[in-house]
From Swiss-Prot:
This is DNA ligase. NAD(+) binds at D33, A34, E35, Y36, D37, S82, L83, E114, R137, E174, K291, K315. Zn(2+) binds at C409, C412, C427, C433. Residues 595-675 form the BRCT domain. It catalyses: NAD(+) + (deoxyribonucleotide)n-3'-hydroxyl + 5'-phospho-(deoxyribonucleotide)m = (deoxyribonucleotide)n+m + AMP + beta-nicotinamide D-nucleotide. Keywords: DNA damage, DNA repair, DNA replication, Ligase, Magnesium, Manganese, Metal-binding, NAD, Zinc. Its EC number is 6.5.1.2. One of its GO terms (cellular component) is cytosol. SMART domains: BRCT (SM00292), HhH1 (SM00278), LIGANc (SM00532). It comes from Proteus mirabilis (strain HI4320). GO terms for molecular function: DNA binding; DNA ligase (NAD+) activity; metal ion binding. The active site is at K116.
């Protein structure tokens, strides 16, 4: 055997274990992920060339072995007992009193307080520092051998790190999944048609009990240790807290949220603090575990049949409960999103009476297989809106009703659109829908739209709440009496606002289209549409294929435009604005400049960076006036990029694509030249 190869492999293993320790235990990585991957790939390559040098504890051996047909049973040498529970302060205080009476000690006891993780309890057996067996808790006496699966979890060291490691030690802890990992796993499952889990605990348990370790290897599992079982050929500190710190030094992850608390007040303060930070932890817990810290006192207190006397789990109120769906209603959000909401038999969840739960969208109803009358599990975590996570199908009544998603808005009866590839269905009646009214009107009068000077958000709020205005056309029918009666509006302000409304009737075609609030139609798209179609009638009659001929208009935008102009309510409001109110815009002027005089005519231009001589809006207006289309992104269709100070990725992309780039001074010169 080449001694140099063995040395390289050993050094790489030591280095990789060191960085795994820093990443998973200390949460203080020294190198970027790419460098870790490079070292790992180098080790894999050397081991592939010299398979006789592969050892079970090598960092490369986490990828997952071949599938099993069944899990072997493992008998725990020391039973993995459960904990007694406290669900209120009185029960916890009784526990503390019981301990002091048993110990014949009136002094306050010091406890090690930890998070009660909501995952799957596991046992890890290390011999001479190497992981040789992993098992589930099972019934406390017998569990399942999950060694190959656990070896794939990067947070669990295959070999302990440091000095004074016992010859044989069993570490106990919890395998769990973070909220972020859980969300990513379910997103991927929905995308690929895989199994969607109800909560992180189910996801962790299902991932850990896979017969195929290669599947487990792809799941975002992690681990915290909290105790010890078998101990042979070594010594540990006589404090539980100190033991956890020792485990951390050996490379085993330990939660940072552990604390020594002396006396009941300190313990209760810790409990309430954890309850407060619980929503921001990033993983699920269901309480606090309170353990006598002194190991000698633990041994003196001993055990009852199923639990230690020296520990208790002080549980939080449940985040999941069962209830029955009585009905489903459909709500309309301020942007027109249609959200199904389940009406429930009221039930207490996490300290709050819950009678409604979001169902998100039609896809979620289909995924759950949900019907009215079903018994369901609902979940409420932190400030998150309660949601239905699963259906208990065996409790489904014979008269359960199918949930039918509406085709018309329940508020304004406009058509509901759902574009292929989008989960959310939306009301198309943006100009008349009461649910969307405030936001639609605020957009309509905004500076880049109809530019009604003085018509602020608070005025719109009052006009809608007092039912003076329902559609954009109603704004132009307001009189001095109505306006002067609004909060903080006198006669002078009312006259000024009426003048601003009158002035706004003379606008541009692009501003008018932008003001309508068609989904996905921003300023740049409005400019492109109006430059291409020239007249309102032509744009209203355009089909999807005709719309897609406009630069930067694809399938989705084209469908939104067609759906908007096909909706009868929208047609009526547009007709009122143009025919009754008299909103007008100049007829398009055909440019007479030769190309040499006007380098912007018909060109797609992108502005990037900070401008010093003009505001971005002023520059955009002058460019559009000369026939340019101002886009927000650089692509192969871009003709010119105008780069101000601190121009970033757009400038880099323009250079990469070979697009003409000019600075602000050159833009000003060309604008002035083209007047």
């Amino acid at each position: 055997m080449n001694q140099n190869i063995q040395q390289q492999i050993d050094e790489l293993r030591v280095t990789l274990r060191h960085h795994e320790y820093l990443y998973h235990v200390m949460d203080a990585p020294e190198i970027p992920d790419a460098e870790y991957d490079r070292l790992m790939n180098k080790l894999k390559a050397l081991e592939a060339e010299h398979p006789e040098l592969i050892t079970p504890d090598s960092p490369t051996q986490r990828v997952g072995a071949l599938p099993l047909t069944a899990f072997e049973q493992v008998r725990h040498e020391i039973p993995m007992l459960s904990l007694d529970n406290a669900f209120d302060e009185t029960t916890y205080l009784a526990f503390d009193k019981r301990l002091r009476e048993r110990l014949k000690n009136n002094e306050e006891i010091t406890f090690c307080c930890e998070l009660k993780l909501d995952g799957l309890a596991v046992s890890l057996l290390y011999e001479n520092g190497r992981l040789v067996q992993a098992a589930t808790r099972g019934d406390g006496t017998t569990g399942e051998n999950i060694t190959e699966n656990v070896r794939t979890i990067k947070a669990i060291p295959l070999r302990l790190y440091g000095d004074n490691i016992p010859a044989r030690i069993e570490i106990r802890g919890e395998v769990f999944m973070t909220e972020k990992g859980f969300e990513h796993l379910n997103e991927e499952a929905r995308r690929t048609g895989g199994k969607v889990f109800a909560n992180p605990r189910n996801a962790a348990a299902g991932s850990l009990r896979q017969l195929d370790p290669r599947i487990t290897a792809k799941r975002p599992l992690t681990f915290f240790c909290y105790g010890v079982g078998v101990l042979e050929g070594g010594e540990l500190p006589t404090s539980h807290y100190a033991r956890l710190q020792q485990f951390k030094k050996w490379g085993l992850p330990v939660s940072d949220a552990i604390k020594l608390c002396t006396g009941t007040k300190a313990v209760l303060d810790f409990y309430h603090h954890v309850a407060e930070i619980r929503p921001n932890l990033g993983f699920d817990i269901d309480g606090v575990v309170i353990k006598v810290d002194d190991i000698a006192l633990q041994e003196e207190l001993g055990f009852v049949s199923r639990a230690p006397r020296w520990a208790i789990a002080y549980k939080f109120q449940a985040q999941e409960q069962m209830t029955v769906i009585k009905d489903v209603e459909f709500q309309v959000g301020r942007t027109g999103a249609i959200t199904p909401v389940a009406r429930l038999d009221p039930v207490q969840v996490a300290g709050v009476i819950v009678s409604n739960a979001t169902l998100h969208n039609a896809d979620e109803i289909e995924r759950l297989g949900l019907r009215i009358g079903d018994t369901v599990v609902i979940r409420r975590a932190g400030d998150v809106i309660p949601q239905v996570v699963s259906v208990i199908e065996e409790k489904r009544p014979e008269n359960a009703q199918e949930i039918v998603f509406p085709t018309q808005c329940p508020i304004c009866q406009s058509d509901i659109e759902r574009i292929e590839g989008e989960a959310v269905a939306r009301c198309t009646g943006g100009l008349i829908c009461a649910a969307q009214r405030k936001e639609a009107l605020k957009h309509f009068v905004s500076r880049r739209a109809m530019d009604v000077d003085g018509m602020g958000d608070k005025i719109i709020d009052q006009l809608v709440e007092k039912e003076y205005v329902k559609t954009p056309a109603d704004l132009f029918r307001l009189d001095e009496k109505i306006l002067s009666g609004l909060e903080r509006m006198g006669e002078k302000s009312a006259k000024k606002l009426l003048n601003a409304l009158e002035k706004a009737k003379s606008t541009t075609f692009a501003r008018f289209i932008y003001a309508l609030g068609i989904r996905e139609v921003g300023e740049a798209t409005a400019n492109g549409l109006t430059a291409h179609f020239v007249s309102l009638e032509a744009l209203r009659e355009a089909n999807i294929e005709a719309l897609k001929a406009v630069p930067d208009v694809g399938d989705i935008v084209a469908k939104h435009v067609v759906n908007f102009f096909q909706e009868e309510h929208n047609k009526n409001v547009i007709d009122q604005l143009v025919n009754d109110i008299g909103i007008t815009w100049p007829a398009p002027v055909v440019a007479t400049h030769e190309a040499g005089d006007n380098p912007f005519a018909g060109k797609t231009v992108v502005l990037t960076g900070s401008l010093s001589q003009l505001t971005r809006d002023e520059a955009k207006d002058r460019l559009v006036a000369l026939g340019a289309k101002v886009s927000g992104s650089v692509s192969k269709k871009t003709d010119m990029v105008i780069a101000g100070e601190a121009a970033g990725s757009k400038l880099a992309k323009a250079n990469e694509l070979g697009i003409t780039v000019i600075d602000e001074d050159e833009m000003i010169r060309l604008l002035d030249q083209s007047k």
